């Protein structure tokens, strides 16, 4: 995931300029269906993590990890292209507004599929 160095540079004001959009959050949560365990890849500050589920986050930027919102899921340092989890460890995996930053998006999506028990679902903001 190449966004680590980028967000270590520009992420200092991220929480001051970005807010969770309720419509987008609702679409993401609906797309997760009845998934109880969720991996959030390229998680940033955790603002789109669903409540009421067991979420674990992966984020490459130390600065973004340090700005996780109160109550956000535990977050590990890591890359989408090499997720440190066994096959089918989660009901679902999510990634919001991050894939375009990954060094190898195809590898990252394959990794998400590998660690998730169900096929991907997409939620696209309109």
Predicted regions and their residues:
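Conserved class I S-adenosyl-L-methionine
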Residues: 1-36, 47, 63-67
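Local beta-strand N-terminus motif with an aromatic residue
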Residues: 35, 90-91, 117
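Class I SAM-dependent methyltransferase SAM/SAH-binding core
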Residues: 37-82
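Short amphipathic alpha-helix with an adjacent loop that forms part of the alpha/beta core around
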Residues: 85-87
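A conserved beta-strand element that flanks and buttresses the S-adenosyl-L-methionine
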Residues: 94
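Short catalytic micro-motifs in class I SAM-dependent methyltransferases
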Residues: 97-98
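A short glycine-rich, Lys/Arg-flanked "PGG" loop and its adjoining helix->strand segment in the class I
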Residues: 106-120
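Acidic carboxylate diad motif detector
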Residues: 124-126
């Amino acid at each position: 995931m190449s966004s680590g160095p980028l967000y270590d540079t520009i992420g200092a004001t991220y929480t001051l300029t970005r807010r969770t959009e309720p419509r987008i959050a609702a679409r993401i949560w609906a797309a997760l269906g009845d998934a109880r365990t969720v991996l959030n890849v390229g998680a940033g500050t955790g603002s789109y993590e669903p409540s009421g589920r067991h979420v674990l986050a992966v984020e490459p930027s130390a600065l973004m990890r340090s700005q996780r919102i109160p109550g956000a899921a535990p977050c590990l340092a890591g890359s989408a292209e090499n997720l440190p989890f066994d096959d089918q460890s989660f009901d679902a995996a999510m990634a919001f507004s991050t894939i375009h930053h990954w060094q190898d998006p195809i590898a990252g999506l394959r990794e998400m599929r590998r660690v998730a028990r169900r096929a991907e679902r997409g939620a696209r903001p309109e």
